[in-house]
From Swiss-Prot:
Location, primary (coarse class): cytoplasm
One Gene Ontology cellular component annotation held by this UniProt entry: cytosol
Catalysed transformations (reactions): guanosine(37) in tRNA + S-adenosyl-L-methionine = N(1)-methylguanosine(37) in tRNA + S-adenosyl-L-homocysteine + H(+)
Any one GO molecular function term: tRNA (guanine(37)-N1)-methyltransferase activity
Known function: Specifically methylates guanosine-37 in various tRNAs.
Gene of this entry: trmD
Protein name per the record: tRNA (guanine-N(1)-)-methyltransferase
Short name of one Pfam family: tRNA_m1G_MT
Family according to the record: Belongs to the RNA methyltransferase TrmD family.
Alphabetic keyword roster: Cytoplasm, Methyltransferase, S-adenosyl-L-methionine, Transferase, tRNA processing
Subcellular location: Cytoplasm
Length: 246
């Protein structure tokens, strides 16, 4: 997968390209991240990248010309088929369905805004989609872009040790993840559920599914409203609800 990034702070993306799972993906050529800094497309000695908004008001906008030229350069490098995304609080909220959808693209260009944002006409002419990571405002689009890259990279074949890891994560099937345990067997007086040490794989599967359903019902009940549960899931959910209410 190829991802181009337009950012005034490309150094921030070393967190993605040099560390952890995504860093290994880059090292093994499963993921390529290229950055373009609008400052490199300026023509004045101060490398100005901000400009005053028409109509006045507080704050500045990103200057059109350097940003536009950076986007065009990224598009040329990507070739055909690249989807251009602007990270914005006004965008579609990123969830697991959205991540799965975006992961189907082989090429993405992520535009990271700064200041008060970018000219609306650039959104109309250069941007394919706007995406948000939540209903709050950050100082720039870099952290949302890194969040998006990390999330979609998990779906690239070979990035995770086991593809099942991505398939069993929270939200992968619309449910929250089940609890997980590792050594020691007893921690602060709390023990590992016996079923997990039983070696009975079918019982372990059912326990994990039941815990996932219970956790979703208790913490994020709205997630269950849009799901078509299987007969087994409905049965396990009823059991979990009865146990909780008893």
């Amino acid at each position: 997968m190829w991802i181009g990034v337009i950012s005034l702070f490309p150094e921030m993306f070393k967190a993605i390209t040099e560390f952890g799972v995504t860093g290994r993906a880059v090292k093994h050529n499963l993921l390529k991240v290229e950055c373009w800094n609008p400052r490199n497309f300026t023509f004045d000695k101060h490398k100005t990248v901000d400009d005053r908004p028409y109509g006045g008001g507080p704050g500045m906008l990103m200057m059109v010309q350097p940003l536009r030229d950076a986007i065009h350069t990224a598009k040329a490098a990507a070739g055909e088929g690249a989807k251009v995304i602007y990270l914005s609080p006004q965008g579609r909220k990123l969830d697991q369905d959205g991540v799965t959808e975006l992961a189907q693209n082989q090429k993405l260009i992520l535009v990271c805004g700064r200041y008060e944002g970018i000219d609306e006409r650039l959104i109309q002419t250069e941007i394919d989609e706007e995406w948000s990571i939540g209903d709050y405002v950050l100082t720039g689009g870099e952290l949302p872009a890194m969040t998006l890259i990390d999330a979609v990279a998990r779906f690239i074949p070979g990035v995770l040790g086991k593809q099942a890891s991505a398939e069993e994560d929270s939200f992968a099937d619309g449910l929250l993840d089940c609890p997980h345990y590792t050594r020691p067997e007893v921690l602060e007086g709390l023990t590992v559920p016996p079923v997990l040490m039983s070696g009975h794989h079918e019982e372990i599967r059912k326990w994990r599914l039941k815990q996932s359903l219970q956790r979703t019902w208790f913490r994020r009940p709205e997630l269950l409203e849009g799901l078509a549960l299987t007969d087994e899931q409905r049965k396990l959910l009823k059991e979990a609800q009865a146990e909780h209410n008893s």
